[in-house]
Amino acid sequence: MSCPMRSGFVDSVQGGHHLGSEAGMLYGEYLMLDKVLSAQRMLSVEGKKPVHDEHLFIVTHQAYELWFKQIIFELDSIRDLFSTEHIEESRTLEILKRLNRIVMILKLLVDQVPILETMTPLDFMDFRDYLSPASGFQSLQFRLLENKLGVKSEHRVKYNQKYTEVFASDPGAIERIGTTETEPSLADLVQKWLERTPGLEQDGFNFWGKFQESVEQLLAEQEASAMSEEHENVREYRLMDIDKRREVYKSIFDAQVHDALVARGERRFTHKALQGAIMITFYRDEPRFSQPHQLLMLLMDIDSLITKWRYNHVIMVQRMIGSQQLGTGGSSGYQYLRSTLSDRYKVFLDLFNLSTFLIPRQSIPPLTNEMQKALNLAWGSPAHFARNGSLH
């Protein structure tokens, strides 16, 4: 047996035809690397005082913008998949795949911030003056991303509500922003999808009515238990806690109270969409609700990671310029960025708060036989799928 490392053997293995010698598009041409890799314009170099870390600053922010573009690309495709009233399971799988891709990209963006932190505040000061009045506040793609997700103008902090003014000299940017403010956002489409959750029909399973009965029974049992408490202080404390719980549940069972909370910006979903989200959460172990529950988890992941990215950005800015200086674009810098960490910027805030309304597993309304069949998948029975259709 001949040695595989002999030169003749290696030569024969490597003797394939070199594709680069054929006519056609090469790697660099396909990726347009001549444009991408020549886009790092260092103003410190042009000013005859080159600052090494300016190159890192430019490359990192250009990478952010490329990833923002990919997230927007995925968001647009997801919104398109959600735009139809009838969503097949195969489409839901595609939505999950693309939402997960956005989550993975956002994790990468969060991890990019520490790379910028390898630059010291003094290093940044060496070229900061070249940036003014440029600012991350002027990132058109990030504003488009926020709008496409569902951040509404009224939920932005006061300074951020006038975010379009920085694009006044760019009619194309203003038009794109206007489009994203009027077209259905991902949050809008998810809300309509949740409103169609099977089992909410009052003349069907009527989950909401059954859930309300379960809560009333649970609170009555807890109240009876509290009344049997011998120690007055403990009894009063338990009764007070039950009264608070009753008020919390009233905020979801009374549509007017819920709508008032939406008007105040403390909730996002319509009353019926919130019902759908709670139902999916309770029955997530049922086969037909497995994918919808995963979808809700991914939406929260997206909100969480954007908040983490904002937080990391805030800490980095404080390290670089402190908490008193103005940002290069004229904002209050650190103070403004810190204000964006509030719940006002959480698009899917209601999903985070669903745990407030959970009840013990044994108190969850049992599914009827008909509903149990509707939420289960039959294997190899086309007639079953014809009868039950897809989830929403």
Swiss-Prot record:
Key words, A-Z: Dioxygenase, Heme, Iron, Metal-binding, Oxidoreductase, Tryptophan catabolism
SUPFAM superfamilies the record matches: Indolic compounds 2,3-dioxygenase-like
Documented EC number(s): 1.13.11.11
Binding site for substrate: 57-61, 128, 328
One GO term of the biological process aspect: ommochrome biosynthetic process
Keyword tRNA-binding: no
Keyword Cell membrane (UniProt): no
Cofactors that this protein relies on: heme
EC class (word): oxidoreductase
Family in the record: Belongs to the tryptophan 2,3-dioxygenase family.
HAMAP family with a match to the protein in the record: T23O (MF_01972)
Protein name as catalogued: Tryptophan 2,3-dioxygenase
Organism whose genome encodes this protein: Anopheles gambiae
Lineage, top ranks: Eukaryota, Metazoa, Ecdysozoa, Arthropoda, Hexapoda
